[in-house]
Amino acid sequence: MKTLQELTRPNIWRLKPYSSARDEYSGAAASVFLDANENPYNLPHNRYPDPMQRDLKLELSKIKKVAPAHIFLGNGSDEAIDLVFRAFCEPGRDNVVAIDPTYGMYQVCADVNDVEYRKVLLHDDFQFSADELLAVADERTKMIFLCSPNNPTGNDLLRSEIIKVINDFEGLVILDEAYNDFSDEPSFLSELGKYPNLIILQTFSKAFGCAAIRLGMAFASEGIIGVLNKIKYPYNVNQLTQQQAIEMLHKYYEIERWVKTLKEERGYLEEAFVELPWVLQVFPSNANFFLARVTDAVKIYNYLVGEGIIVRNRNSISLCGNCLRVTVGTRAENAKLIGALKKYQ
């Protein structure tokens, strides 16, 4: 791979980051804080949070088996996605490559940052060829985006192809594992040390059941994490979010129980969908959702809205004509969905 300095925008490499009051003093011995222009009333919410989220990263490192220095935390994974564009891509000059279809925020962030976004269509089985992806890259390609399990298709990408991309590409590979907890395929986290150009994204929004607190994770080399920390906003993860995340990590057994239940419910829904006469195909999924091709996605979607049930109409997405994306809910929610669909005319 290219050196980190070669990949980083020159102005970012030279940047002297903002230093907050809590960056300059983070000790625990003091009892009077008169350095940050905070209001002394309304404890504990009057104080700025730890800008480096040290306590949270320490707890997270115990679960993920990754050292805190290799962890970046942001306001949702979308913050990390935006930051890698801002850190590594020269607006109007550089480009990135991604599979298609996939998570839409990669392209949104590319467009916002004036970075060319090159799509490589997945095969009919929703897999990709590393060679096809690499063939689209050139000397101005800074990043390749992969999502596994992929959204909206739900399938794991072939591990051998992912590894080939990481090994053969000279830039950064962003591997989004937002749904990996629901897959039987192991995360790439245990192999992070082997691949200095790999950035792994995960989230508290899915398996952890914490979409409301907006907390995303990026795992990478210490150098890459240092670049992201240099350009992030000073207090990007609020104290309430940090506290809630620590509480969830302390009861990780509960998350594991939820994941097991949701995987069972996914199977229940998939089997029920196969029996519906207007369902043409249910695609295999390793996420907490699945994709189903139906006879008329728009009509069925509108019918369900009328029944007070909301799924996602993916009809306009590449390779997903007449497809609905269905998130796995509780047994009661899933049964209500199936009951409504059985009455659909």
UniProtKB/Swiss-Prot annotation:
InterPro entries given in the database record: Aminotrans_II_pyridoxalP_BS, Aminotransferase_I/II_large, HisP_aminotrans, PyrdxlP-dep_Trfase, PyrdxlP-dep_Trfase_major, PyrdxlP-dep_Trfase_small
EC class: transferase
Catalytic activity: L-histidinol phosphate + 2-oxoglutarate = 3-(imidazol-4-yl)-2-oxopropyl phosphate + L-glutamate
Keywords for the protein's UniProt record, in alphabetical order: Amino-acid biosynthesis, Aminotransferase, Histidine biosynthesis, Pyridoxal phosphate, Transferase
Cofactor(s) of this protein: pyridoxal 5'-phosphate
Gene name tied to this protein: hisC
EC number: 2.6.1.9
Ranges in a coiled coil: none
Domain of life: Bacteria
GO annotation (BP), single: L-histidine biosynthetic process
CDD domains, sorted: AAT_like (cd00609)
Sequence similarity: Belongs to the class-II pyridoxal-phosphate-dependent aminotransferase family. Histidinol-phosphate aminotransferase subfamily.
Name of protein: Histidinol-phosphate aminotransferase
Positions bearing N6-(pyridoxal phosphate)lysine: K206
Pathway terms, separated by semicolons: Amino-acid biosynthesis; L-histidine biosynthesis; L-histidine from 5-phospho-alpha-D-ribose 1-diphosphate: step 7/9
Single Gene Ontology MF annotation: histidinol-phosphate transaminase activity
UniProt source species: Bacteroides fragilis (strain ATCC 25285 / DSM 2151 / CCUG 4856 / JCM 11019 / LMG 10263 / NCTC 9343 / Onslow / VPI 2553 / EN-2)
Oligomeric form and interacting partners: Homodimer.
